[in-house]
A protein has these predicted regions:
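Conserved phosphoryl-transfer catalytic core
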Residues: 46-106, 120
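Glycine-rich beta-alpha loop elements in corrinoid/cobalamin-binding modules
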Residues: 10-13, 18-19, 23-52, 93, ...
Length: 272
């Protein structure tokens, strides 16, 4: 049997959820052809890249301007300033984003000093708060923290002007924590990050692939449920009944144990 195991967005970047590795090893030990795709980290690299940020700023520009104007009208000068600063420094963010990720991965040492001290390195509110809190001259020992805050600042921009469901460690968590109908949850499948960025991740990973016999989607937390549904829908739209889609994981075991929503059958074949 040909099996694909998927970790959907979004889980902690610095502590990957291990279920995919365990499941892959389990199936391989049974003699199956199995591979694991961590689409959570894939989405991060898709979004936080030169191409990704260029597209983000293009898609969000008009909305950002409107929200900045509204914030100023409402007397929220700080929000208006921060949103406009993202737009005015977008070229710096785009130029630096690949190096920021390299620094976070411990591979960008030649850029660390420049990222700390260059007047052209991007800055956001979280980064400035961190630097001000040091009460000393920053050093290369601080650079990875600063890079982490850079991603957090970008995430704040995304949440404020582009996709209110986005977070670095979860996506649309409230949709499954609150009491909402499944139809309401389905409407959120077309939210911006899913539509414009996660769809590209799925296409890059699977558009040229043959149909697997089974797709196992691990859902450890509520904040991965909506992307998991989006993933399941992609496979069903592409392969129809030829693919058997299963969901499982911590969230499924605790929150979906007694699920009776018939519409879920459009996306999956089984719950484990």
């Amino acid at each position: 049997m040909n099996i694909t195991v998927i970790t959907p967005p979004l889980v902690q970047l610095n502590s990957p959820y291990p279920s995919g590795a365990y499941l892959t090893s389990f199936f391989k030990n049974l003699g199956h052809d199995c591979r694991w795709k961590d689409l959570s980290i894939a989405l991060v690299y898709e979004l936080f890249s030169k191409e990704g940020l260029s597209r983000l700023f293009e898609l969000s520009h008009e909305s950002a301007l409107r929200l900045a104007d509204k914030a100023q009208t409402d007397g929220d000068e700080n929000t208006a300033f921060n949103i406009r600063r993202y737009l005015s420094t977008k070229d710096n963010w785009i130029k630096w984003i690949d190096d920021i990720l390299l620094i976070l991965c411990g591979k960008g040492r030649e850029k660390e000093h420049q990222f700390l001290f260059s007047p052209f390195a991007p800055r956001g509110a979280r980064m400035e708060t961190f630097l001000a809190g040091l009460e000393r001259e920053p050093s290369v020992d601080d650079v990875r923290f600063l890079a982490s805050y850079a991603l957090a600042d970008l995430a704040d921009y995304i949440t404020a002007v582009f996709d209110s469901e986005f977070s670095l460690i979860r996506y649309a968590e409230h949709l499954t924590v609150d009491e909402r109908t499944f139809a309401q949850i389905e409407k959120e499948l077309e939210s911006p990050v899913m539509k414009y960025f996660y769809q590209k991740v799925l296409e890059k990973n699977f558009d040229k692939e043959d149909c697997p016999d089974m797709v196992c989607i691990s859902i450890p937390f509520a904040g991965t449920f909506l992307p998991a549904l989006y993933t399941a829908r992609y496979f069903k739209q592409r392969f129809g009944d030829k693919v058997f889609v299963v969901i499982g994981g911590g969230f499924v075991n605790t929150e979906l144990r007694d699920v009776s929503e018939a519409a879920l059958g459009k996306y999956i074949n089984a719950i484990s």
